């Protein structure tokens, strides 16, 4: 089951929330219900963003910084603005697959579990680029429809 751990983010000082298929948040006004919902949406959408980025850039290899860290940092700031206090948020997709975001010493740090990094390292540059760059265009057969 997915889980989120939030420390010192907005109105939430310390929370660990299990995330079933259906989650009902009840509480006083300004207690952090919307913040929790927005964080859950944000982290769930990262998984989709990650997959899209892996398939979107076929002309080069992939890098952790350019293909995940920088876009995630930008997206976080779009969603929540620039932080003004130290915080840490960890989202558990599974027991061993996590993404953490923390603000420490005026830096927004993004960390992911090793399994995500292994996936990125395992994505090779597409082989067809080598083929096309070494082939004369007149040698490529035309396909008529």
Describe the function of each predicted region:
Residues 1-145:
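P-loop NTPase switch/coupling surface
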């Amino acid at each position: 089951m997915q889980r989120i751990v939030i420390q010192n983010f907005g109105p939430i000082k310390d929370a660990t929330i299990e995330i079933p298929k259906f989650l009902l948040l009840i509480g006083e006004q300004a207690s952090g219900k919307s913040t929790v919902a927005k964080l859950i949406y944000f982290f769930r959408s990262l998984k989709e963003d990650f997959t899209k980025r892996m398939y979107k850039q076929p002309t080069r290899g992939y890098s952790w910084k350019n293909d995940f860290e920088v876009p995630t940092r930008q997206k976080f700031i779009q969603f929540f603005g620039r932080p003004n206090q130290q915080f840490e948020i960890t989202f558990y997709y599974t027991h061993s697959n996590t993404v953490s975001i923390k603000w420490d010493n005026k830096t927004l740090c993004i960390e992911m579990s090793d399994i995500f990094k292994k996936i990125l390292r395992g994505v090779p540059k597409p082989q067809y680029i080598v083929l096309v760059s070494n082939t004369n265009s007149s040698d490529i057969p035309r396909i008529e429809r």
